[in-house]
C-alpha cells in the first residue's frame, strides 16, 4: 500500500471516529500528531482531514443531493467517511488527484472496510458527482476564490 493509500485510510479512520463520537475531526487528529504512542501522521492525512472538515457542509449537501433515496443518517458511518473524503478529493484536490483516481481509491477503501453493497453505492454517488465536476468546481471557486 502506497503512502497516499495509507494516508487516505488513516484519514477515513479519523473521520469515522470523529463522526461516531460527535467530535471535530481536526481536533481529534491534532491529538494524534506527534503522539509518541501512535505512528506518525502523514502530511496528506492532515490535508485530507482538514479539507473535509473545512468543506463538510457543502460536501454533505452534495452527498444528500446525489445519493438518490439516501440520507446521511441512513448511510453506514464508514460509507459516509469514505464518501466525504472521496468527494473532497474529487472537487477540491482535482489538480492533484484525477477524478478517476479519487473514485477508485474511495471504492477500494469501502471494499476493505464496509458492506458488500458499499462499493457499488460509493462508485455511483461519486460517479454522478464527477459527471458534473467541472461545473461544481467552477461554482466552488466562484464562492471561494483560490480554493482547490
Curated annotation (Swiss-Prot):
<dbReference type="InterPro" id="IPR006027">
    <property type="entry name" value="NusB_RsmB_TIM44"/>
</dbReference>
<dbReference type="InterPro" id="IPR011605">
    <property type="entry name" value="NusB_fam"/>
</dbReference>
<keyword id="KW-0804">Transcription</keyword>
<dbReference type="Pfam" id="PF01029">
    <property type="entry name" value="NusB"/>
</dbReference>
<dbReference type="GO" id="GO:0006353">
    <property type="term" value="P:DNA-templated transcription termination"/>
</dbReference>
<keyword id="KW-0889">Transcription antitermination</keyword>
<keyword id="KW-0805">Transcription regulation</keyword>
<comment type="function">
    <text>Involved in transcription antitermination. Required for transcription of ribosomal RNA (rRNA) genes. Binds specifically to the boxA antiterminator sequence of the ribosomal RNA (rrn) operons.</text>
</comment>
<protein>
    <recommendedName>
        <fullName>Transcription antitermination protein NusB</fullName>
    </recommendedName>
</protein>
<dbReference type="GO" id="GO:0003723">
    <property type="term" value="F:RNA binding"/>
</dbReference>
<dbReference type="GO" id="GO:0005829">
    <property type="term" value="C:cytosol"/>
</dbReference>
<comment type="similarity">
    <text>Belongs to the NusB family.</text>
</comment>
<dbReference type="GO" id="GO:0031564">
    <property type="term" value="P:transcription antitermination"/>
</dbReference>
<dbReference type="InterPro" id="IPR035926">
    <property type="entry name" value="NusB-like_sf"/>
</dbReference>
<keyword id="KW-0694">RNA-binding</keyword>
